[in-house]
Curated annotation (Swiss-Prot):
GO cellular component terms, A-Z: cytosol; I band; nucleoplasm; Z disc
Residue numbers spanned by region Disordered: 19-60, 81-145, 166-204, 230-266, 359-392, 535-652, 674-704, 725-747, 762-814, 840-865
Subunit structure: Interacts with TTN/titin, NEB, NEBL, ACTN2 and CARP.
InterPro entries: Ig-like_dom (IPR007110), Ig-like_dom_sf (IPR036179), Ig-like_fold (IPR013783), Ig_I-set (IPR013098), Ig_sub (IPR003599), Ig_sub2 (IPR003598)
Modified sites of kind Phosphothreonine: 249
Pfam families for this protein: I-set
Keyword Phosphoprotein: yes
Residues with the Phosphoserine modification: 99, 129, 641, 754, 809, 814, 903, 924
Identification of the protein by name: Myopalladin
Molecular function (Gene Ontology), one example: actin binding
Disulfide bonds: 288-339, 453-512, 1089-1141
Length: 1315
């Protein structure tokens, strides 16, 4: 069979050689075909493969390929094995088409073959010349030539495409390059007899997938490829000439061109990555071990993004061990980490989930400042969805984006399908159920918002998030997290949706849906985003150098109607027709400029909504109601482009004396008209609208924008002092005509008043009109750095809800308040002061000239100095006290006004709830009993109404109320700062109604009531809890009065220096506190607590009333997360007692106490031998005892050895005994001669080991019976005479002694023993 194949090879070589000589005459045609690049890679699958073209045909390639080309082709074929399998499906079809085309046109190959005559091949060798009859039979000579020429042409064309692909600039893995150099070095020591490698090589080459040529590199490399081909052709002609001379060497083998290499191995991970949960700030290291031949190249990815070495992330390789280390893990490092390994034989990967636990169990909060900085630095950065595989070669990356598979968030949120098993081993099957529902949230623009719910079910449910019916996918703006259950005892999963920064378009209904094959359940919550109210006069305006003409703006044809979000819109839509530049950083686009008019018909809707801001899309203006300003229909210009730069927010323009005169006359006219109307109380109507008259063109300079507006006061009032409310804000239209709206309730007035308004300079004059309120303020004299500004026009509040302007000003109201001068406003509401002289509407004395000059204005500011400073101080104090009473009265009248806590505090409370639900509690205060095994339908507790957060003043009552439903009726537990509230507590009264409403009432609050209140409901189906925060605030008013004494004549710079006096102050309260603890002596004890307050409080630890001082065993630490810790290491009995932690700042102090019990350390004592073993000897056949006494704590364990060999307990004739006193005995009964030897007793316990050794000798029986006549006499001779005389000698002794006497008669007694 081998001879047949060799002869066939010889004939093929001859045919190819003849074909080559004929083809060299048509070089011109070959040059043209050579210039055509091969764009479609394909396999070699010639038509003759089934006709005998087996592995034996491969040596024929040496007839037209040089040694170097053969080696390189093998290497390139191996490289092609690592080709992306995704392309092989498309290439297979291309190969079929190419194979059929090449069969038709094989007689005209597109590439000129290069022949190389091997000196080992020729008919001169007798082994290579078998008989003619053994050759394979073909139909004709012509057909055989055609078949083999087709095969040769196909393979040559394939090799040519490989060479071209190899010469391109494709980046290959390092492992491939190393492998090539290794192969080339081995080819230098080729050996001659390797008959099997040719078969293996051909199989390798036929299975290879050539690497496609990138289209952009073909033209650049075409000339280089032609030059290389020309050089090889000339070498082939030279070699063909030598072959024609018939030069051959017998004994050479056709397979001498190849050298057999060891087979490669694809990568394989022997140690995979492991998922884990780690606390924030700790060091995280991922380790994996991968093997492969050649050593694979390893790449790391996080959520589809490749990771590289950096100061934060270290990638290390030590042999086959690959490690990824995160030096300090933060919450944004949470994600799926993957490791990909690849070499020329394949790829492998392993992945793991890393969850960074922050303060909360379900947070993914990043640093807002850091995120803001990133948005400013990278405004146009677009995040792409993570890809599932990172092992995509460069050729695949050049494909269109549509060809790449899209990974949806649903896959990331899928839970494992494994079933939890019950106690009987069978899987637990249950439909999903929410153990904690979503909560309605309200936030301001730019805040971080976290939706959290908890769900359980078996199999683990699949969780999806929707906004207004639209599926939310994981992205940097919407992070979706799902924390798997820790164990079967805690089967619930924590599902979290984190919105890094909310905007008004994010308002809407959010739904979390959990489903498995047994059911689906959903939880719905509403998110209300309030407009950004933090635009102050410190340069936050982003637009400048703009000119606006209100007259032109009034005649724009179509109004702007913001469209509400629809279900088909994505979570972050770019709303059409909204003047928001989405290409700008998100911080600059917070100034929403969409216009909303508050109509009388909309007042009810506004009161129902929980928040409305400058960019609120939940309210639209009815088209049928035209607003009229000065008798003209208002027209709002539409933006020319939805991505157009937002129009500038107008600062206050400078008014010259002529304009001041016009304003002054108009205000006086309006005041007279108001006096003629029927007076009405300010409580009846407080609807104010200001507008539509401005200078024809107002130009704002950049200096005006950057600097603070002269009349814009900082009204950033501490939010914890006055009850928060949802009032409408002033919105600015593109036509620079602001619309000012105030809610129609006196509560709004009280809530809107800013405490910092009391810190402003007292106005020189104030005026009131019978029918309304006129609010004015005057400027201070200009400082050297700032120009002087004229006074602002007055805003008057008419009676009735009319959209009729009563004053004219183009100045927008500061978004932090609805009233420009709260001091004047309060003065109008409160009783007027008799010391204030009457003024006109401009705030000037009535005797002032109609056109006041700047000097006269300065003089009028000093008019109140006629009154004594003490009187002014007393009157102001009375005003402020009256204000405090009114505020308190408003709070009591409207009961409790809830306020919104920060997202950070909310997640802290969620963490407390999470731990409380897993902590054993005392018996419930309810008289409700639950069966151990529930029967019938059971429903876990659900909150129909949750607790709210309240801010009250000291001494006010407060009531926490919620409603709980569940079957059976749940038990209820109340906690304050993690400690259960007893029903015997007289201060906190707990009630429960029949409908499930539960309440906790405090009649009179004081400072110690400040904290977190949690209610937990439990029944056999599960537990659920929710929390509310109570902030008890005093009224430290007099300590804040000093800035109110500042004169109007002081400069703005001096007022700015006093701004730190407006700092917020919060009394300390503990967010986290430990309970009573039990610790073991000698170990580490840690007491952790978390406290909040402004300024940050100082903590002091007391033990039984005495301060705990830091020393070698007591350390006080503060972590970055704000957790304070007291470390005691090692713990001693002296550390037991009552610990008290006191937090103190300038507003007060707070404390908690706990009892620390120290368990005594177990006493350990090494064994001690009290009685050692004694050397002894006994006659053979007698029993023997080896005795000793050993003590130790804990009691030791005894081991017996004979000649260093352990004596088993089951050996016959030997028994071991011991008692509680430490006595130990080894009894041998009877003793034999083989028992002689050295015996060792060892005693061992946890503290140590001790041993002792003794010798046992066994004597022969005859050794004791040798008679000694001199010292031996009959034992009974002394008493014989007495006994014969009738005297009973033995009766005179005791039974023991008599027994001894009888026993002595059995043997002779040595005299020395008797003596």
């Amino acid at each position: 069979m081998q001879e047949d194949s060799i002869e066939a090879s010889t004939s093929i070589s001859q045919l190819l050689r003849e074909s080559y000589l004929a083809e060299t005459r048509h070089r011109g045609d070959n040059e043209r075909s050579r210039a055509e690049p091969s764009s479609n890679p394909f396999h070699f699958s010639g038509p003759g493969a089934a006709e005998g073209g087996g592995p034996e045909d491969l040596p024929d390639l040496s007839a037209f390929l040089s040694q170097e080309e053969l080696d390189e082709s093998v290497n390139l074929a191996r490289l092609a094995i690592n080709h992306d399998p995704l392309e092989r499906v498309d290439e297979a079809q291309a190969r079929k088409r190419l194979s059929s085309d090449q069969t038709k046109h094989a007689s005209k190959p597109s590439f000129e073959p290069a022949f190389h005559q091997d000196s080992s091949r020729g008919p001169a060798s007798p082994k290579d010349s078998p008989p003619e009859t053994k050759r394979p039979q073909y139909s004709s000579e012509t057909q055989s030539k055609k078949v083999f020429l087709n095969k040769a042409a196909d393979f040559i064309e394939e090799l040519s495409s490989l060479f071209k692909a190899h010469s391109s600039k494709r980046i290959r893995p390092r492992a491939c390059k190393n492998h090539k150099s290794k192969t080339e070095s081995q080819n230098k020591v080729l050996q001659e007899n390797s008959p099997t490698f040719s078969d293996l090589t051909e199989r390798r080459e036929r299975a290879s997938v050539p690497i496609p040529i990138p289209a952009d590199s073909r033209d650049n490399e075409l000339n280089h490829a032609i030059e290389q081909r020309e050089a090889k052709r000339r070498e082939a002609e030279l070699a063909a000439g030598e072959a024609a001379a018939g030069d051959s060497t017998p004994g050479s083998s056709p397979s001498s061109l190849y050298y057999e290499e060891p087979l490669g191995q694809p990568p394989r991970f022997t140690q995979k990555l492991r998922s884990r949960e780690v606390p924030e700030g700790s060091r995280v290291q991922l380790d994996c071990i991968v093997v492969g031949i050649p050593p694979p190249q390893v790449r790391w990815y996080c959520e589809g993004k490749e990771l590289e070495n950096s100061p934060d992330i270290h990638i290390v390789q030590a042999g086959n061990l690959h490690s990824l280390t995160i030096a300090e893990a933060f919450e944004e490092d949470t994600g799926r980490y993957s490791c990909f390994a690849s070499n020329i034989y394949g790829t492998d990967s392993t992945s793991a989930e890393i969850y960074i636990e922050g303060v909360s169990s379900s947070d993914s909060e990043g640093d807002p400042n850091k995120e803001e900085m990133n948005r400013i630095q990278k405004p146009n950065e677009v995040s792409s969805p993570p890809t599932t595989s990172a092992a995509i070669p460069p050729a695949a990356e050049a494909q269109p984006l549509a060809a790449q598979p899209r990974v949806s968030t649903v896959q990331q949120c899928q839970s494992p399908t494994n079933y939890l098993q019950g106690l009987n081993g069978k899987p637990i099957i249950a439909a999903p159920v929410f153990t904690k529902m979503l909560q309605n949230l309200s936030a301001s623009e730019g805040q971080l918002v976290v939706f959290e719910c908890r769900v359980k079910g078996a199999p683990s449910p699949k969780v999806e998030w929707y906004r207004e019916g639209t599926l939310i996918e994981d992205s940097p703006d919407f992070r979706i997290l799902q924390k798997k259950p820790r164990s079967m005892a805690e089967p619930e999963e924590i599902c979290t949706l984190v919105i890094a920064e909310v905007f008004s378009e994010d308002s809407g209904c959010f739904t979390c849906t959990a489903s498995n094959k047994y059911g689906t359940v959903s939880s719905i919550a509403q998110l209300d985003v309030r407009g950004n109210e933090d635009i102050s006069d410190n340069g936050a305006l982003h637009s400048a150098n703009s000119t606006t003409n209100p007259a032109v703006a009034e005649h724009q044809p179509s109004p702007l109607n913001p469209q509400p979000l629809s279900e088909e819109q994505p979570p972050k839509p770019k709303l059409e027709g909204v003047l928001v530049n989405h290409n700008e950083p998100r911080s600059s686009s917070r100034i929403g400029l969409r216009v909303h008019f508050n109509l009388p018909e909309d007042d009810k809707d506004m009161e129902a909504s929980s928040g409305s801001g400058a960019a609120n899309t939940s309210q639209t203006r009815p088209n049928s109601f035209p607003e009229r300003f000065n008798g003209q229909e208002a027209r709002i210009p539409e933006p020319s482009s939805p991505i157009k730069e937002p129009p500038p927010v107008l600062a206050k323009p400078k008014l010259d004396s002529t304009q001041l005169q016009q304003l002054h006359n108009q205000v006086l006219l309006e005041q007279q008209q108001l006096q003629n109307t029927s007076p009405s109380s300010p409580k009846e109507s407080l609807h104010m609208s200001a507008l539509n008259s401005a200078p024809p063109a107002v130009t704002i300079s950049s200096k005006q924008v950057k600097g603070p507006a002269p009349q814009m006061f900082n009204l950033a009032r501490p939010k914890h002092f006055f009850p928060a409310s949802s009032t409408s804000t002033a919105t600015v239209s593109p036509s620079s005509s602001p619309v000012f709206t105030l809610s129609n309730t006196p509560q709004t007035i009280q809530r809107t008043v800013s405490k910092e308004s009391l810190l402003m300079a007292h106005p020189s004059t104030q005026g009131r009109s019978p029918g309304g309120l006129s609010i004015q303020n005057e400027p201070a004299p200009p400082s050297p750095a700032e120009p002087a500004a004229p006074p602002t026009a007055a805003y008057s509040i008419p009676s009735g809800n009319q959209f009729q302007p009563h004053c004219v000003s183009p100045t927008p109201v500061s978004p932090t308040g609805r009233i420009q001068n709260p001091v004047a406003f309060l003065s109008s509401v409160l009783p007027s002061l008799p010391s204030i002289p009457p003024t006109n509407a401009m705030g000037l004395p009535k005797s002032a000239p109609s056109v006041p000059s700047q000097g006269l204005m300065k003089k009028t500011t000093k008019a109140p100095q006629a009154v004594s400073d003490d009187y002014i101080r007393e009157t102001k104090n009375s005003v402020i006290l009256d204000l405090g009473k009114k505020v308190n009265f408003g709070d009591v009248r409207s009961h409790q006004q809830e306020y919104k806590i920060s997202s950070f505090e909310q997640r802290l409370m969620n963490e407390i709830e999470f731990r409380l639900e897993r902590t054993p509690v005392d018996e419930s205060d309810d008289e409700i009993e639950h069966d151990e095994i529930p029967t019938g339908k059971c429903i876990a507790p659900i909150f129909d109404k949750r607790l709210k957060h309240f801010r009250v003043t000291e001494g006010s009552p407060v009531t926490f109320t919620c409603k709980i439903v569940g079957i059976p009726v749940p038990k209820v537990y109340w906690f304050k700062d993690g400690k259960q509230i007893s029903k015997r507590n007289e201060h906190c009264k707990m009630r429960r109604e029949g409908d499930g409403t539960c309440s906790l009432h405090i009649e009179s609050t004081h400072g110690d009531d400040d904290g977190n209140y949690t209610i937990m409901a439990a029944n056999p189906q599960g537990r659920i809890s929710c929390s509310g925060h109570l902030m008890v605030q005093g009224l430290p008013i007099r300590s804040r009065l000093s800035p109110a004494l500042s004169h109007r004549g002081r400069s703005r710079m001096q007022e700015r220096d006093k701004e730190p006096l407006q700092e917020r102050f919060f009394r300390p309260h503990f967010l986290q506190a430990p309970g009573d603890m039990v610790a073991h002596e000698g170990r580490l004890c840690r007491l952790d607590c978390k406290v909040s307050g402004l300024p940050p409080p100082e903590l002091t630890w007391l033990l039984n009333g005495q301060p705990v001082l830091p020393d070698a065993s007591h350390k006080m630490l503060v972590r970055e997360t704000g957790v304070h810790s007291l470390l005691i290491d090692p713990l001693t009995q002296r550390d037991a007692g009552t610990y008290t932690c006191v937090a103190t700042n300038k507003t007060g102090q707070n404390s908690f106490s706990l009892e620390l019990t120290v368990v005594a350390k177990e006493v350990k004592k090494a064994p001690v031998i009290l009685e050692k073993l004694q050397n002894s000897g006994v006659p053979e056949g007698h029993p023997v005892r080896l005795e000793g006494r050993v003590i130790g704590m804990p009691p030791p364990v005894f081991y017996w050895k004979k000649d260093n060999e352990t004596i088993p307990f089951t050996r016959e004739r030997i028994s071991m005994h011991q008692d509680t006193t430490g006595y130990v005995c080894l009894l041998i009964q009877p003793a034999k001669k083989s028992d002689a030897g050295w015996y060792t007793l060892s005693a061992k316990n946890e503290a140590g080991i001790v041993s002792c050794t003794a010798r046992l000798d066994i004597y022969a029986q005859w050794h004791q019976q040798i008679p000694t006549p001199i010292s031996i006499r009959p034992s009974g001779s002394r008493y014989g005479s007495l006994t014969s005389k009738g005297l009973d000698i033995f009766s005179a002794f005791s039974s023991v002694e008599s027994t001894m006497l009888y026993s002595c008669t059995s043997r002779s007694v040595v005299e020395s023993d008797e003596l």
